[in-house]
Structures are given as structure tokens and as C-alpha cells.
């Protein structure tokens, strides 16, 4: 079960860009799995269930965060992403994560989820289509828009040409 906990927490952290929200999503996924008697068997359908459920709860967390911000209930909450990197000492790592989180802030929840699963988690597109229950053309469209958003954020710093290096760095560090 430890293997799936790592996968859930990594995916949720990359989608939400927030450690606290990621931990909450991880706890809720595991509680729901226990309640529904879903057992992680190392892969296959159970792994897809955990990933699908993680993505659903992340979407709900983003929507809740956006609603709290829009209704002026909590102005300290970012609309989608809050780049909290206090635990990192390296300036380059902090800056890269902040660039990623700002790019995520400009994406729709589905764009972020598709990008994380396909690009950062290296899941095959056919499997992501099944998990998210979307068509191939919809997934391609989501990925193009997400990639364009990250490239645009990198262009602000004059680093648009370093997209592949940036993605490799994010995968390695987070």
C-alpha cells in the first residue's frame, strides 16, 4: 500500500501545487478506498481507480479553493495554486517550482490533470483517456494548451527554449 500512497501524494502535489491540500486529498483517497474495499494489487484496474479518484478529488479541491477566493471568504487562498516551497533551500528549485505553479494557475483543472498524468507521470495517452474518460482529441487539446501555458510562463523569463530541460527538472525534483 505504501507504493500507491507515494503515487497518490506525488500526483496530487503536482496538480495542486500545495502540500497541505495534497495531504488532505491523499487521506481522503485512502479513506474512500478503505470504505469501498478497494485493494491496491500493484497495478492494473486498482491503480487506475486510485489515480482516477485522486484526480477527481484534486479537481474538487481546485474548485473549492476557487470558490473560497471568489466569495471573499478566504483571500489568503490562491485561486488555483500556491507555490509553497519553504522546505527547499535551493533558489533554482524554488524558482522552477514557482514558474510551474504560475503556469498551472492559468490552466483549467483538466489541463493540469492531463499534463501531470501524461507528461510528468509518463502514463500512456490511451490509459489517461480511460482514466479521465475523455476522447483522444480532447486529451490532445488539453495537452497542447497546458504545454503552451508552461512555455508562455517560461517565455516571461526568456527561457522558452528550455522547455524540455524544465520539464525534466520538475520530474526529477517533484
Identify the residue ranges that each predicted region occupies.
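Short helix-coil-helix linker/hinge
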Residues: 94, 104-112
Amino acid at each position: 500500500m505504501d507504493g500507491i500512497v507515494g503515487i497518490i501524494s506525488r500526483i496530487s502535489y503536482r496538480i495542486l501545487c500545495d502540500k497541505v491540500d495534497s495531504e488532505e486529498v491523499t487521506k481522503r483517497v485512502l479513506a474512500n478506498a478503505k470504505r469501498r474495499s478497494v485493494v491496491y494489487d500493484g497495478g492494473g484496474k486498482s491503480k487506475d481507480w486510485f489515480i482516477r479518484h485522486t484526480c477527481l478529488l484534486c479537481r474538487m479541491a481546485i474548485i473549492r479553493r476557487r470558490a473560497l477566493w471568489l466569495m471573499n471568504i478566504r483571500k489568503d487562498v490562491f485561486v488555483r495554486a500556491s507555490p509553497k516551497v519553504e522546505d527547499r533551500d535551493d533558489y533554482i528549485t524554488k524558482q522552477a517550482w514557482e514558474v510551474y505553479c504560475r503556469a498551472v494557475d492559468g490552466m483549467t483543472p483538466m489541463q493540469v490533470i492531463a499534463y501531470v498524468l501524461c507528461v510528468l507521470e509518463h502514463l500512456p495517452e490511451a490509459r489517461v483517456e480511460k482514466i479521465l474518460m475523455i476522447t483522444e482529441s480532447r486529451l490532445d487539446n488539453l495537452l497542447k494548451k497546458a504545454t503552451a501555458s508552461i512555455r508562455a510562463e517560461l517565455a516571461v523569463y526568456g527561457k522558452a527554449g528550455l522547455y524540455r530541460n524544465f520539464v525534466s527538472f520538475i520530474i526529477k525534483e517533484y
